[in-house]
């Protein structure tokens, strides 16, 4: 009798794990909800210097973030969302984006650090070297981490 109960529990557990895995593979909520995306983006502008608003007209943005990082403007200008470790432009993430994702100045991707759609020509003060994410497998790992699951 104990064997059947154990088997049933195991089947239920496997089923739950499959549901969780599917959840991690879904599009991040902010890619599908403009209000949530805007809220997260605005918080990143306010708290983490996300910018410049218009990459073609940056104003004094690069000077300000260079001061924040205690570096040169030239160095700051190379630290972009497009080469940040949390910037996701994997095939699966591009499928989550609404419409056209690129223009002459860059590409729209997803920021796993701040949970919003961001542009590759911008930056923020939490930039970290090592990106972008171009592989679906790596994107899924970031998705798991975003939902609080430890990496295997």
Where are these regions (language model features)?
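N-terminal intrinsically disordered, low-complexity leader regions
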Residues: 1, 11-13
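Cysteine-centered metal-binding/redox modules
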Residues: 7, 15-152
């Amino acid at each position: 009798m104990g064997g059947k109960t154990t088997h049933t529990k195991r089947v239920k557990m496997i089923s739950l794990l499959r549901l969780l895995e599917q959840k991690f593979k879904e599009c991040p909520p902010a890619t599908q909800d403009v209000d949530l995306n805007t809220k997260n983006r605005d918080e990143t502008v306010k708290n983490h210097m996300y910018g410049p608003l218009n990459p073609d007209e940056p104003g004094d943005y690069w000077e300000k973030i260079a001061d924040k990082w205690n570096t040169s403007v030239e160095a700051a200008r190379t630290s972009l969302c497009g080469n940040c470790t949390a910037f996701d432009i994997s095939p699966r993430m591009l499928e989550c984006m609404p419409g056209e994702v690129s223009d002459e100045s860059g590409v729209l991707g997803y920021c796993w650090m701040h949970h919003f759609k961001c542009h590759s020509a911008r930056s923020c003060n939490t930039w970290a070297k090592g990106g972008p994410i171009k592989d679906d497998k790596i994107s899924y790992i970031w998705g798991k981490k975003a939902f609080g699951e430890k990496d295997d």
